[in-house]
Amino acid sequence: CRGIDETGATDYSWKRKRAALHGGIDMPAPFGTPMLAAASGTVVAIFIGERSARGTQIVLRHGPRDTGIPLWIYSLYAHCDSMPDLEIGQRVKVGQNLGPTGNTGINPKLGYDAGRRRPAIHFAVLYATSPDYTVHRGHVIPKDGYWMDPNALYKGRLPLDSAAMKALPKAEKAVPIPVALDDGTLRPADTKFVWPYACWRD
């Protein structure tokens, strides 16, 4: 399976004109590699992102029935190579192809696309107790929403907040990651979540 090369909460101040932390995880993949829906849900935003460091991106909202978690969860897939063939309000299934991996997005310091970013997915996850959200300047903002470590999603249960995750005993921090294989098979077959890239059989 494809791994993470930039973790969440990494200091991004050197990349920005201000203090900043990385709000997700990055996983490099060749151009065109399908980005997969981490869970079943509804498309709530698609941004072309011409003036955004995230470039072209998709945001899904996952309700409690989708995940089995009593919260509203939002997953974000950024740096798509092209606009996805999806519509706002469309339902997607866990493991569904959302769009091709690319390297879209501007260099925040230069203010334009320098074309040097390696192709990768920027995968971010937020959670909220309310289904309400707003869209503002290329961002989906959940009401009373919180960022979370995307890896915590794969626990499939509460708690999800970073402080609680940090406080877990070391033995409980390892999370088995359910996946979609490159032939579309889910492992385990009844999983509600998958890694946002397909894995390949040995």
What are these regions (language model features)?
Residues 46-47, 61-63, 78-81, 101-102, ...:
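Active-site-proximal beta-strand/loop segments in catalytic clefts of secreted hydrolases
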Residues 58-59, 90-169:
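Conserved, short, structured surface segments that act as functional micro-motifs
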Residues 1-56, 63-65, 94, 107, ...:
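Surface-exposed, glycine-biased beta-strand/turn segments
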Residues 51-52, 65-72, 132-134:
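Short, solvent-exposed loop/turn segments that connect beta-strands within catalytic domains
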Residues 30, 36, 68-95:
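Short histidine-centered loop motifs in beta-beta connectors
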Residues 50, 69-72, 83-86, 105-116:
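Short, charged helix-to-loop "capping" segments that act as catalytic/coupling loops
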Residues 20-22, 53-55, 72, 116-121:
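Short, solvent-exposed loop/turn segments at the edges of secondary structure
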Residues 26, 76, 100:
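Conserved beta-strand positions that form and line the central face of beta-propeller blades
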